Amino acid sequence: MDKIYAIIPVNQFANAKTRLSPFLTPEERRDLLKAMLKDITDTLKPIVDKVVIISRDEEVLAYAEELELTTIVEEEYKKSKAVNSSDDNPLNKALKQAMKWSRKKTRKVIILPSDIPLIGKTNVKLLIDQAKNFDFIIVPSKGGGTNTLIIKPLAIDMKFEGFSFNKHIEEAKRKKLVPIVHDSFYMALDVNTTEDLGEIMLHGNGTETKKYLESLGIKVESSHDHERLKVTRD
């Protein structure tokens, strides 16, 4: 059994990307997340054995089924009483649930967020090839978080939230795993701000995400202000 499953946790569409408000309306943010999710899963489908979406949102699960993805309904979150438990975070609990579901079906999992539409087949193939020889591969996000993990199911406790990159490295070392770090501009780019939208406009040729942003009349130009890119819309 030398399979690899992709696991993507997705929050509610209705609450997506609030940091992009008021630049994008709630409906536009919902459609943006749908476009990003399609880009990511279209990239993954030919490369992994199964793409799994875990969510508690019926709209997310229905959309995932439209995309012909495997879905898992997230268990109702109940805050753990244990101090510093990874289960205090609903995202970590959802990922643990998905890995429990996966562990007898696949040798490894690749865990990704739903907002990194520029990951690209080349990057993903490279990581999966590396995973044949290494049991812990991690891709940092630009803000100290974690944008991709490849591990055996339940190999470590999930430490998402805040500066999770260093937390996951520490957890790997605690479990005697050798961390392999893959730095990639495209995989580090998670979309949270208007400047991130500008990066998609510059680098997202051929993606559903860029096509959607273009349909909104979004434009980008160089800026000499405190932000590197000036992002506007018609």
Swiss-Prot record:
UniProt pathway: Cofactor biosynthesis; coenzyme F420 biosynthesis
EC number(s) from the headed UniProt entry: 2.7.7.68
Lineage: Archaea, Methanobacteriati, Methanobacteriota, Methanomada group, Methanobacteria
Class of enzymatic activity (EC top level): transferase
Name this polypeptide is given: 2-phospho-L-lactate guanylyltransferase
Gene3D superfamilies according to UniProt: Spore Coat Polysaccharide Biosynthesis Protein SpsA, Chain A (3.90.550.10)
InterPro entries linked: CofC, Nucleotide-diphossugar_trans
HAMAP family linked: CofC (MF_02114)
Functional note: Guanylyltransferase that catalyzes the activation of (2S)-2-phospholactate (2-PL) as (2S)-lactyl-2-diphospho-5'-guanosine, via the condensation of 2-PL with GTP. It is involved in the biosynthesis of coenzyme F420, a hydride carrier cofactor.
Pfam families: CofC
BP GO annotations: F420-0 metabolic process
Top-rank lineage group of the source organism: Archaea
Family from the record: Belongs to the CofC family.
PANTHER family per UniProt: 2-PHOSPHO-L-LACTATE GUANYLYLTRANSFERASE (PTHR40392:SF1)
